[in-house]
């Protein structure tokens, strides 16, 4: 393994092997897991139309294609908007007892979205309890039909 920090664990979280697992590192697109978890916890209808997509399709695009714009829109359409979404993400992190994980934006583009390999295991374990995330993790490609609205003047 050539990664600077890593951790191998059983499904139950038992660590098999690791190196520098408690070092804080930028987590890039893994951020999208926390964004989607937070959006799903808000219990907004998955079939709500947001621009040309449903909320479920935006979740799929964020997870399967790692689409930054989809993650951003999901956060913007969170109850209370973007700011409340980021607050809710960090509240979820605190509930999980994660002290080294910090998120400042929903896509993973910021190097200031950070965590450790040890804390990421807990995030992945939580993510595995959401059927929508499990479904997306088993999917390598998606086909989404864009809906175009006709506007009359």
Predicted regions and their residues:
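Penicillin-recognizing serine hydrolase domain
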Residues: 1-5, 9, 80-153
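Active-site SXXK
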Residues: 6, 12-13, 24-50, 120
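Active-site-proximal beta-strand/loop segments in catalytic clefts of secreted hydrolases
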Residues: 9-11, 20, 62-67, 74-75, ...
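A structural microfeature
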Residues: 16-17
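A glycine-rich, coil/turn loop motif that links secondary-structure elements
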Residues: 21-26, 51-52, 106-114
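Extracytoplasmic/secreted envelope proteins and their assembly/folding machinery
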Residues: 31, 36, 55-60, 71-75, ...
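Short, well-structured active-site flanking segments
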Residues: 41-53, 130-140
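Conserved catalytic neighborhood of penicillin-recognizing serine enzymes
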Residues: 47-78, 150-153
């Amino acid at each position: 393994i050539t990664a600077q920090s890593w951790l191998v664990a059983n499904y139950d979280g038992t660590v098999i092997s690791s190196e520098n697992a408690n070092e804080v590192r930028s987590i890039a697109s893994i951020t999208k897991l926390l964004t989607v978890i937070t959006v799903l916890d808000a219990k907004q209808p998955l079939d709500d139309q947001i621009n040309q997509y449903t909320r479920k399709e935006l979740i799929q695009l964020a997870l399967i294609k790692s689409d930054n714009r989809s993650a951003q829109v999901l956060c913007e359409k969170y109850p209370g908007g973007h700011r409340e979404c980021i607050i809710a993400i960090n509240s979820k992190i605190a509930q999980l007892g994660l002290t080294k994980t910090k998120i400042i934006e929903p896509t993973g583009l910021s190097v200031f979205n950070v965590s450790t390999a040890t804390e990421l295991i807990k995030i992945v374990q939580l993510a595995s309890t959401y059927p929508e995330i499990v479904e997306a993790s088993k999917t390598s490609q998606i086909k989404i039909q864009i809906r175009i609205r006709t506007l009359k003047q």
